[in-house]
Amino acid sequence: SNNIAQTAYKPEGKSPSQLVDEAEQKIFEIAERGSRNSTYLELRQMIQPTYDRLYQRSQKGGGLSGVSTGFRELDRLTAGLQKGELIIIAGRPSMGKTAFALNIAEHIALSDKNNPVAIFSMEMSAEQLTFRMISSLGMVHGSALKTGKLTDKDWDRVDGAIQQMKEAPIFIDDTPSLTPVELRARARRIQRERGLSLIVIDYLQLMQVPGSKENRATEISEITRNLKALARELQIPIIALAQLNRSVEQRTDKTPIMSDLRESGSIEQDADLIGFIYRDEIYHKDTDKKGQALIAIAKQRNGPIGDF
């Protein structure tokens, strides 16, 4: 506490937001040190709860052990989104990353009102996301919503979507350039007040590390490490969308590979699951796969890889 007070009296050219961020970070570190005392467990202590978890899974008939995404093939590969896991969904612009993540968020929140979802959107405003959800749930073309040229049938669908959305426990924070400390504080508050079953971050590279003099790769490493720690702390899955670098554009085969991730080293290391999204029609207008997206699971720490 003395250090925090001294920093406030002697800011050394730092902005108020940087001072608050550093104070929150120091408070978090103090809390972490306290929570880390005597945290070891004997293996024998873990046997019964682990056996109980296995028995619960067997009672489901080999079904999902995590939260259903609403995508049958993704659930088959992952057994659902698992608690404490950091999931990266990556792709080039216009591939449908946000739409894919929103579909998962909508499915989880609408399937059970006790499954609140938090969306931290640093790319789009809350209004833009709301329009996206109306389009998705109401099956109304985005261009019709943008121009306002709606048929009577469109209006019926919009009304139906809005009725569903009123019941959905989805919370949107559209603050740009969040820091890991800010995001963690906001996520904890929602968890404490409403509970959380999933966090979606759109997108990873738009997060910032204030006052950092490190290169961007090192900053991304700090961000992914913090997100993984938050997933474990809150015991929920976190989906972080990520942008792929331009090297994809120089290749004949545009299908994403792991090295296409910007500042990919730490992302690959910290993520429990990495999925790439690819739409062939973006590069080949005459493709027979119009309106289709390929989802490729390139890494899964505790399961198989594959695509659908």
Where is each model-derived feature located?
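Short, small/acidic-rich helices and loops at N termini and domain boundaries
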Residues: S1-K60, G84, A90, M95, ...
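Conserved phosphate/pyrophosphate-binding and hydrolysis machinery centered on Walker-type P-loop NTPases
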Residues: Y9-D21, R33-I47, L64-F71, G148, ...
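Pre-Walker A adenine-sensing motif
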Residues: F71-G80
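Cytosolic-facing regulatory segments adjacent to core modules
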Residues: R76, H107-G195, V209, F308
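Hydrophobic positions on the alpha1 helix immediately C-terminal to the Walker A/P-loop
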Residues: F100
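Conserved P-loop NTPase nucleotide-binding/switch module
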Residues: R132-H141, L204-K228, Q250-K254
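Phosphate-binding/switch region of NTP-binding enzymes
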Residues: T218-F308
